[in-house]
């Protein structure tokens, strides 16, 4: 009888933990983050790698591709003001700018409010000092894009670790390295003067952050 009671208590506790985990509210990114972001296709092709800066309060994002590790004639430099729905493609070498509307404003730098908490796991070892990282895994859908996503953040601090995007036209994997809770120069979120007066180029309603990355 005591064994049955004990099993019932254990089962109830496990159910409570599982319920709490599944109903965990999405965490919020720190006010400022910066570091290295690498994007690859699920086929293993390196698409982009460079430095990112993110202002979570203003919802502004800057990504500058690392020119030293890309065999290309042009390199990505984008500034996105998600709240305003504006995407700038910047060419600092030629001082030119392209400005597009961005109707779909969700992205993987911030966990969407309707994301589901999947699990909390250790990467590496949980028992050896400084040899492990506890992360939370979130997932959800972007119905407008006919896509779904998964994101991993640090358990404490909500720093980005990795993310994946699976859509009808592409599959992407994002990795984040050397993430800091600061941005050295806040001017990275301000479009250059030569972007002023540039006319908007209309984009489809499903134009998104994820369209930036392709083979």
Swiss-Prot record:
Protein name: Ependymin-1
N-terminal signal peptide: 1-20
Post-translational modifications reported in the UniProt record: Different glycosylation variants are known as EPD-beta and EPD-gamma.
Molecular function, one GO term: calcium ion binding
Keyword S-adenosyl-L-methionine tagged: no
Name of the coding gene: epd1
PROSITE patterns in the record: EPENDYMIN_1, EPENDYMIN_2
Expression (tissue specificity): EPDs are synthesized in the meninx and secreted in the cerebrospinal fluid.
Record-annotated membrane-spanning stretches: none
């Amino acid at each position: 009888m005591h064994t049955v009671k004990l099993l019932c208590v254990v089962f109830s506790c496990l159910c409570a933990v599982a319920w709490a985990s599944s109903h965990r509210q999405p965490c919020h990114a720190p006010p400022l983050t910066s570091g290295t972001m690498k994007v690859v296709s699920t086929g293993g092709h390196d698409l982009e790698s460079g430095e990112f800066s993110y202002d979570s309060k203003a919802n502004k994002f800057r990504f500058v591709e690392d020119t030293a590790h890309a065999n290309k004639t042009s390199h990505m430099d984008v500034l996105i003001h998600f709240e305003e729905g504006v995407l700038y493609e910047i060419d600092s070498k030629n001082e030119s700018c392209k400005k597009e509307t961005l109707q779909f404003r969700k992205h993987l730098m911030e966990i969407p409010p309707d994301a589901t908490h999947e699990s909390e796991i250790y990467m590496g070892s949980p028992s050896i000092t400084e040899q492990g990282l506890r992360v939370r895994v979130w997932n959800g859908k972007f119905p407008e894009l006919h896509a779904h996503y998964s994101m991993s953040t640090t358990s404490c601090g909500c720093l980005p670790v990795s993310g994946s995007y699976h859509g009808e036209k592409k599959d992407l994997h994002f990795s984040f390295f050397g993430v800091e809770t600061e941005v050295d120069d806040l001017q990275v979120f301000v479009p250059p003067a030569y972007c002023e007066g540039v006319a908007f180029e209309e984009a489809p309603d499903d134009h998104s952050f994820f369209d930036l990355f392709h083979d």
